[in-house]
Regions:
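Amphipathic alpha-helical packing segments from all-alpha helical-bundle domains
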Residues: 76, 91-95, 124-148, 159, ...
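N-terminal intrinsically disordered/low-complexity leader segments
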Residues: 1-16, 197-207
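Short, basic, alpha-helical segments at the C-terminal edge of helix-turn-helix-like DNA-binding modules
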Residues: 69-76
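Hydrophobic alpha-helical connector segments
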Residues: 66, 80-108, 158-161
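Hydrophobic alpha-helical segments that form the core
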Residues: 153-172, 184-191
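Helix-turn-helix
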Residues: 2, 20, 24-62, 66
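Amphipathic alpha-helical segments used for helix-helix packing
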Residues: 105-126
Length: 207
C-alpha cells in the first residue's frame, strides 16, 4: 500500500512585527512626514494590528523615535566606515562630504529626515529629541575633523561645515536642479577648509 505523503509549504523567513512596522514607518514618514501619517496608515502598510504597534512601541511617538534612531545608527556606521577608509584628516573630512554629495544627488533623496521630523515636532517630542541628538553628533563630528585637519578655529569651522550641510540638504530638497546642490557641497567644503587651515599646517596634517 502506498504511503500518503503530505506536502509541506516551504519555510519562509518571518519578519517580526517590529521590523515590519519600522519598514512601513520608514517609507511613509520619509515620503509624507511624521505628523501627516497616522497609525491606521502605518499598520495597514505593515500588515499588523494597532494592538501590535502599541504592544511593540507603546505609542506613535515612540515609533517615530525608533525610526529616527535607526537611521542615526546607520549614519554613524557609514561615517565610521568612511573615516576608516581614508588616511589623512583632510581626506576623511572631504570623504564625508563626498558621501553627502552622493546622497543629495540620489533619486530617492527627499530631504534630511531629522530636519523634517524636527520641523513637524513640538519641543520634547521624540522627533525633536532625536533630531537634536543627531545634530549635536554631526556638529561634533565636523568640529573634530576640522581640528584634526589643522583648522585654527575648529569650533567655528565645524559650525560653518554644519551650516553648509544643512543648506545643501534643504537646497537639494527644494530646488528642481537637485544636482546643483550636490555638486556644490564638496567644493564649498574644500574652500572652507583651505581658508581655515594655514598652508604650513596642511602639510603636517596630511602626514
Amino acid at each position: 500500500m502506498a504511503l500518503k505523503t503530505t506536502e509541506r509549504a516551504p519555510k519562509t523567513s518571518r519578519v517580526s512585527a517590529r521590523d515590519r512596522l519600522l519598514a512601513a514607518a520608514d517609507e511613509l514618514f520619509y515620503a509624507e512626514g511624521v505628523h501627516v501619517v497616522g497609525v491606521d496608515r502605518i499598520v495597514e502598510r505593515a500588515g499588523v494590528t494597532k494592538a501590535s504597534l502599541y504592544n511593540t512601541f507603546g505609542s506613535k511617538d515612540e515609533l517615530v523615535r525608533a525610526y529616527l534612531e535607526n537611521h542615526f545608527r546607520r549614519r554613524q556606521a557609514r561615517v565610521a566606515h568612511i573615516l576608516a577608509a581614508n588616511k589623512t584628516p583632510r581626506e576623511r573630512l572631504l570623504a564625508v562630504f563626498g558621501e553627502v554629495e552622493d546622497l543629495l544627488a540620489g533619486s530617492a533623496f527627499r530631504g534630511c529626515r531629522f530636519i523634517s521630523a524636527a520641523a513637524e515636532s513640538q519641543p520634547g517630542d521624540a522627533g525633536a529629541v532625536v533630531a537634536d541628538e543627531y545634530r549635536a553628533w554631526l556638529w561634533s563630528l565636523f568640529t573634530d575633523l576640522a581640528k584634526e585637519a589643522g583648522a585654527t578655529d575648529a569650533k567655528q569651522v565645524g559650525r560653518q561645515l554644519f551650516l553648509l550641510y544643512d543648506g545643501a540638504a534643504v537646497a537639494a530638497r527644494m530646488d528642481q536642479d537637485r544636482g546643483a546642490a550636490a555638486k556644490a557641497v564638496k567644493s564649498a567644503a574644500i574652500a572652507l577648509l583651505d581658508a581655515a587651515v594655514p598652508p604650513k599646517r596642511r602639510g603636517r596634517r596630511a602626514q
